[in-house]
């Protein structure tokens, strides 16, 4: 009977230790899932921009339609252009982040066939980010692979 009680106590201790270790690992691991929700073109003109979008109205003014759930997430929109020939698209090489900065390495790829003449447009990529990682004042910068600045903003 004593043996069974000892095993039971050891099992409880092992279970609690495993649970505690699991929680420590989960708390220490702050992986954030950023989803690319949409990519395309918009006829809303302007230059290169990186914008933080917190509501449907602002997203609509950019000419972007996407099912963003603003109650639990926010959008980050990279706009590049304008262009007057069809076929441009954005290529995002990497996204890196720390507590003070988010760095996006991206560029636009020109069409292989030089494209067709078109009304001016800009390309965009929309990322969805959970609200739990929103930190006012964090710098968001977009650079080319050769480290030339494209656009910068701060989380308001």
Report each predicted region and the residues it spans.
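Compositionally biased, low-complexity intrinsically disordered regions
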Residues: 5-6, 19, 145
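Bacterial N-terminal signal peptides
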Residues: 17-25
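Exposed, flexible binding/inhibitory loops of compact, secreted disulfide-stabilized domains
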Residues: 28-156
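N-terminal secretory signal peptides that target proteins for export/translocation
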Residues: 1-12
């Amino acid at each position: 009977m004593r043996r069974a009680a000892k095993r039971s106590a050891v099992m409880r201790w092992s279970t609690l230790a495993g649970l505690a270790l699991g929680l420590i690992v989960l708390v220490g691991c702050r992986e954030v899932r950023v989803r690319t929700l949409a990519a395309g073109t918009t006829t809303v003109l302007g230059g290169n921009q990186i914008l933080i979008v917190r509501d449907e109205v602002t997203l609509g003014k950019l000419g972007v339609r996407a099912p963003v759930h603003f109650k639990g997430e926010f959008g980050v929109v990279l706009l590049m252009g304008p262009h007057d020939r069809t076929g441009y698209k954005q290529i995002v090489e990497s996204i890196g982040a720390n507590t003070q900065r988010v760095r996006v390495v991206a560029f636009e790829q020109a069409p292989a066939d030089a494209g067709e003449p078109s009304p001016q447009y800009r390309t965009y990529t929309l990322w969805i980010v959970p609200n739990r990682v929103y930190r006012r004042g964090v710098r968001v910068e977009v650079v080319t692979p050769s480290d030339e600045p494209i656009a910068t903003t701060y989380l308001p």
